[in-house]
Every structure is written in structure tokens, then in C-alpha cells.
């Protein structure tokens, strides 16, 4: 789990600036409370292909994604959504890891509020 959290936060570049040791530790503490059965069961959701369902989404959608996401790289995930979903707005957070609500909260909140005002 240490490796996942390090990648989740891009700890190699953001530790001590946008990610505190306390934030990392809080995530660790939460992760170790998960049941082993639940951890194994969730893996199936990562491998399910939902692409055929995307054109059926008929509500406006906001997708926020960090361009430095090492868990789910932008080019392989969110950048593919425009054209597959009718009304999708993709906001790319520069320098953002997978954990953008923690590391780039101001930008995430601004994007959310702008989207809700539409």
C-alpha cells in the first residue's frame, strides 16, 4: 500500500509542498482499516469496461484530472471521454496527481463551482 499511496500523491515530487506527511499518514490509516475481502473484491471494478455505457449518459458531466496522474494517466483515461459522452467538460489540473482534491483543492473547487453555475 505504501507504493500505491506514494503514486497516489506523487510523493516523490510533492512531499513537503502540496502533500504533508500527515495527509499521507491519514490515507495509510484509512487504508489499513479496509477488510481484505473488500480490497480484493474492488479489483473487478477496475477491469470492467464501461465504454459502451458512456454514450447513454445524458446529463452534463465534469471530469477533473491531473496531468501528472501516475495511477490513471490522463492520455489513457479522461482525454478519451470527449466524443464518447454528449456533454462532458474535461478540466486538466496542471501538475496534479491522482489525489487532486488534496493537492490542488483550490483549482478543484473553482472548477466545481464554475461547472455548477452553468
What residue spans do the PLM features occupy?
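Residue-level signal for the nucleotide or nucleotide-sugar donor/cofactor binding architecture
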Residues: 34, 52, 72, 100-103
Amino acid at each position: 500500500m505504501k507504493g500505491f499511496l506514494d503514486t497516489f500523491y506523487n510523493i516523490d515530487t510533492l512531499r513537503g509542498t502540496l502533500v504533508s506527511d500527515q495527509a499521507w499518514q491519514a490515507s495509510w490509516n484509512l487504508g489499513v482499516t479496509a477488510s481484505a475481502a473488500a480490497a480484493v473484491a474492488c479489483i473487478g471494478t477496475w477491469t470492467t469496461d464501461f465504454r459502451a455505457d458512456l454514450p447513454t449518459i445524458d446529463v452534463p458531466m465534469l471530469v477533473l484530472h491531473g496531468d501528472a496522474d501516475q495511477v490513471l494517466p490522463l492520455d489513457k483515461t479522461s482525454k478519451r471521454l470527449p466524443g464518447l459522452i454528449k456533454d462532458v467538460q474535461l478540466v486538466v489540473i496542471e501538475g496534479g496527481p491522482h489525489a487532486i482534491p488534496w493537492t490542488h483543492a483550490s483549482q478543484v473547487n473553482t472548477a466545481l463551482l464554475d461547472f455548477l453555475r452553468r
